[in-house]
């Protein structure tokens, strides 16, 4: 989501990086877990409040895609600060993350992010939107092509639509993976546009 709905977009404060999220909290949806989630010994030692920030820090420190995106954003004049631009929160539904334009923060849904690999995909997905906004000054509410392009890039480049993830979502078809992947990367674009009321789903 970019700017305030119904009003003009406000620029960032002096020296504050441009970070906006196009899809009004619908980013990085994951299928709901079936039954009660199994907790391992180590994960049972941490409460949700502790595990989300720890997984985020590990992702920022070790995930090569995240490190590449953070470096690219820094070189584009949009440096990201962990304390300022990331927030672990409890979210409704099965949304895993999104961007809150009113606070310029990537919101990580601590109740829906299941493990370290999932955290890496969500952070990567959201940073792709932030990078698109930084480098291209995307108009999220006025140009649905910008929104769709960013969603397709994020779904494709973040690993959301990998063969393994699609198999876990019970979308089978080894020979037809390219067709399944095409459907996967277009799904978030359609969801974001329908949430904004720009197209009917």
From Swiss-Prot:
Binding positions (a divalent metal cation): 125, 129
UniProt-listed InterPro entries: Peptidase_M76_ATP23
Active site (catalytic residues): 126
Keywords: Hydrolase, Metal-binding, Metalloprotease, Protease
PROSITE patterns: ZINC_PROTEASE
Enzyme Commission identifier(s): 3.4.24.-
GO process annotations (BP): proteolysis
Region: Disordered, residue numbers: 1-40
Gly residues biased stretches: 1-10
Top EC class of this enzyme: hydrolase
Gene Ontology terms, MF aspect: metal ion binding; metalloendopeptidase activity
Superkingdom assignment: Eukaryota
Entry similarity comment: Belongs to the peptidase M76 family.
SUBUNIT field: Interacts with XRCC6.
PANTHER family: MITOCHONDRIAL INNER MEMBRANE PROTEASE (PTHR21711), MITOCHONDRIAL INNER MEMBRANE PROTEASE ATP23 HOMOLOG (PTHR21711:SF0)
Name of the molecule in the record: Mitochondrial inner membrane protease ATP23 homolog
Native organism taxonomy: Eukaryota, Metazoa, Chordata, Craniata, Vertebrata
């Amino acid at each position: 989501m970019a700017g305030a709905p119904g009003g003009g977009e406000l620029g960032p404060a002096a020296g504050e990086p441009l970070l906006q999220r196009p899809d009004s909290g619908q980013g990085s949806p994951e299928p709901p877990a079936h039954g009660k989630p199994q907790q391992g010994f180590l994960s049972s030692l941490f409460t949700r409040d502790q595990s989300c920030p720890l997984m985020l820090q590990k992702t920022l420190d070790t995930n090569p895609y995240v490190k590449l995106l953070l470096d690219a954003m820094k070189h584009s004049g949009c440096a990201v600060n962990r304390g300022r631009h990331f927030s672990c929160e409890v979210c409704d539904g099965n949304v895993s993350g999104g961007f809150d334009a009113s606070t310029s923060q990537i919101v990580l849904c601590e109740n829906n992010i299941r493990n370290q690999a999932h955290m890496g995909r969500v952070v990567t997905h959201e940073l792709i939107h932030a990078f698109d906004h930084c480098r291209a000054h995307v108009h999220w509410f006025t140009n649905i092509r910008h929104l769709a392009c960013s969603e397709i890039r994020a779904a494709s480049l973040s690993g959301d639509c990998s063969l393994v993830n699609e198999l876990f979502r019970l979308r089978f078809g080894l020979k037809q993976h390219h067709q399944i992947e095409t459907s996967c990367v277009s799904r978030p674009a359609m969801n974001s546009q329908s949430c904004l009321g720009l197209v009917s789903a």
